[in-house]
C-alpha cells in the first residue's frame, strides 16, 4: 500500500520539496496552493518570483524576505511553532521509527512519550492555543490518512488492549490479520497493544511464509505486556521487525487521549490523534470492507454501537459488514449481540451482521456479508 500519487486526491496540496519544485516548474504559480510543513529556506528565489495569491504556507520555514513578499501578495503564512514535540502541520502519517525514535535512551525520550506529556500538561492548563494546535494536527493527520487510503478496501479489526502476547487469543488475532491482508484487504486497527497489535502483526507477516509468524509470536511472548515496561515491550517488536524487515503494510489509528497505551510497531502507517472521538469515528468510517470485533470490554462495546449507528440510519450509505467473534463473550459476558440483532431487525443492516464462535470463521463471514 503506497501513498496516493502527487495530487491525485488533494490536487492543490504540496507536502515535499519535490512537489513544490514540480508545481513551480509546471504551473509557474503557487496561487491557492496549500504548502504543508516543507522547509523552503532554499527556495527564496522561487517565492520571490511566483504568484502566491490565496496560498497558505503551513509551518514552512522560509527566509524573512520571502515570508514578507508572499504575505504582501495575498498568502497566509502560519509559521512553525517552536518547542513542540510534534508538527501540527505535518503532511504525512507517522511511522513506528518516528514515534519511537530515541527508544534506546528510554521510552520517556521518544516523540510519542513527549507528545503525550505535552498533551497532559496543556489539557490540564486549558490552554486555548494548545487546543487549536491539537485540532490542526488532527485535521492534518486525517488529510494524510485519506490520501493514503484512496481506492483501498479497508477492514477494521477491533479488540481490547489487555490481550497479552503469548496467549491463544493473541495468536488468533494475528492469524486473522494475516489472512485478511493476504486476501488483499488493508487491515486497520486502533493502533495500540493487545488485539490491535496482533492484527497489525499478522498483516506485517503476510508476505512471509507461515513459519515466520510462529517464530515471531514466540519471540514477542518474552515481553507479554506493555506493563511494567513499555520500553521492553517495544524493543521486542522492533527486534522482530529487524529480523524480518519489509513486512506487509497496515494502518494503526491510536490516540494520545489513551497515551498510557503505546502505539504498536507493526502498523506501517500510524495516524495518531489527540482527540479520541475523531480517531474512533475516523477508523470506523474508513473501514469500508467491514469491521471484525474481537472480545473486549467497554471500549469495544462502544465501538460496536458507534459503527451500528450509521449502519442503522445508512448515513454513510449502504451498511458495512459487522462480524462479532466469540459467541459466549457477546451473548453472556457482555450481551451486546441481542441488542445489535434487535436494532438490525427489518432494516438493511440485518443482512450485514454476523456472530461467529471462532476467530477462524471471521474472514468467511466478512466475505459472506459482502465485505
What are these regions (language model features)?
Residues 153-157, 168-216:
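N-terminal active-site beta-alpha-beta segment that forms phosphate/nucleotide-binding
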Residues 63-67, 165, 260, 329-335:
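Short, charged/polar "capping" segments at the starts of alpha-helices
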Residues 57-61, 288-309, 319-329:
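Glycine-rich anion-binding loop/nest that anchors nucleotide
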Residues 166, 195-199, 299-306:
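Short glycine/serine/threonine-rich phosphate/pyrophosphate-binding segments
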Residues 5-130:
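N-terminal accessory interaction module
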Residues 66-67, 71-105, 124, 132-148, ...:
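ATP/NTP phosphate-donor binding region
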Residues 25-44, 49-53, 194-290:
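Acidic/glycine-enriched connector segments
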Residues 11, 15, 283-285, 317-371:
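C-terminal functional extensions of proteins
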Amino acid at each position: 500500500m503506497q501513498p496516493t500519487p502527487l495530487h491525485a486526491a488533494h490536487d492543490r496540496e504540496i507536502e515535499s520539496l519535490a512537489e513544490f519544485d514540480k508545481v513551480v516548474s509546471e504551473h509557474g504559480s503557487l496561487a491557492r496552493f496549500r504548502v504543508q510543513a516543507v522547509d523552503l529556506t532554499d527556495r527564496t528565489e522561487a517565492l520571490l518570483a511566483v504568484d502566491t495569491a490565496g496560498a497558505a504556507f503551513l509551518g514552512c520555514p522560509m527566509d524573512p524576505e520571502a515570508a514578507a513578499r508572499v504575505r504582501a501578495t495575498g498568502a497566509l503564512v502560519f509559521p512553525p511553532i517552536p518547542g513542540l514535540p510534534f508538527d501540527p502541520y505535518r503532511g504525512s502519517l507517522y511511522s513506528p521509527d518516528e514515534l519511537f525514535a530515541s527508544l534506546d535512551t528510554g521510552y520517556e525520550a521518544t516523540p510519542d512519550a513527549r507528545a503525550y506529556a505535552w498533551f497532559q500538561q496543556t489539557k490540564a492548563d486549558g490552554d486555548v492555543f494548545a487546543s487549536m494546535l491539537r485540532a490542526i494536527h488532527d485535521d492534518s493527520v486525517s488529510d494524510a490518512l485519506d490520501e493514503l487510503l484512496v481506492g483501498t478496501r479497508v477492514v477494521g479489526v477491533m479488540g481490547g488492549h489487555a490481550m497479552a502476547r503469548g496467549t491463544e487469543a493473541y495468536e488468533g488475532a494475528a492469524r486473522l490479520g494475516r489472512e485478511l491482508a493476504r486476501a488483499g484487504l488493508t487491515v486497520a486497527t486502533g493502533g495500540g497493544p493487545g488485539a490491535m497489535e496482533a492484527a497489525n502483526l499478522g498483516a506485517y507477516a503476510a508476505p512471509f511464509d507461515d513459519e515466520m509468524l510462529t517464530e515471531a509470536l514466540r519471540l514477542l511472548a518474552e515481553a507479554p505486556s506493555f506493563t511494567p515496561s513499555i520500553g521492553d515491550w517495544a524493543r521486542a517488536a522492533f527486534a522482530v521487525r529487524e529480523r524480518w524487515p519489509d513486512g506487509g503494510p497496515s494502518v494503526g489509528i491510536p490516540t494520545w487521549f489513551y497515551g498510557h497505551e503505546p502505539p504498536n510497531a507493526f502498523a506501517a502507517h500510524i495516524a495518531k490523534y489527540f482527540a479520541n472521538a475523531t480517531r474512533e469515528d475516523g477508523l470506523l468510517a474508513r473501514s469500508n470492507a467491514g469491521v471484525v470485533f474481537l472480545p473486549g470490554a467497554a471500549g469495544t462495546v462502544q465501538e460496536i454501537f458507534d459503527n451500528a449507528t450509521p449502519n442503522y440510519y445508512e448515513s454513510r450509505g449502504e451498511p458495512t459488514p459487522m462480524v462479532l467473534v466469540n459467541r459466549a463473550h457477546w451473548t453472556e459476558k457482555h450481551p451486546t449481540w441481542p441488542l445489535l440483532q434487535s436494532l438490525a431487525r427489518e432494516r438493511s443492516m440485518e443482512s450485514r451482521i454476523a456472530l461467529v464462535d471462532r476467530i477462524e470463521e471471521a474472514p468467511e463471514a466478512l466475505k459472506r456479508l459482502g465485505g
